[in-house]
Amino acid sequence: MAEMITEAAILTQQAAQFDQIASGLSQERNFVDSIGQSFQNTWEGQAASAALGALGRFDEAMQDQIRQLESIVDKLNRSGGNYTKTDDEANQLLSSKMNF
């Protein structure tokens, strides 16, 4: 079986990039929400219902995307920590066996 080598620092960097994407989506979501609220008083009838429904679906979809990205960030950060811990434990075990 091939050896798997993982750079914990790269996992952390990737987590930061996903976190930036989630943050950007949150800002865009807030921007769209504010536009929708500003027009809300001028919409009437079916147009208002359709627009509010569309904005609601958009908001739900954006929130789901943000949650998914936050989950990826959490998993990448935990994975990086786990790999570092495993490497440290392996180094300590090797050092103790070889009397370093």
UniProtKB/Swiss-Prot annotation:
Entry-linked InterPro entries: ESAT-6-like_sf, T7SS_ESAT-6-like
GO cellular component, one term: extracellular region
Organism superkingdom: Bacteria
Major subcellular site: secreted
Keyword annotations from UniProtKB, A to Z: Chaperone, Secreted, Virulence
SUPFAM superfamilies: EsxAB dimer-like (SSF140453)
Compartments where found: Secreted
Keyword Secreted included in the entry's annotation: yes
A Pfam family assignment: WXG100
Entry keyword annotation includes Secreted: yes
Function: A secreted protein that might play a role in virulence. Might serve as a chaperone to prevent uncontrolled membrane lysis by its partner EsxA.
Record text on subunit structure and interactions: Forms a tight 1:1 complex with EsxA.
Family the entry assigns: Belongs to the WXG100 family. CFP-10 subfamily.
Name under which the protein is recorded: ESAT-6-like protein EsxB
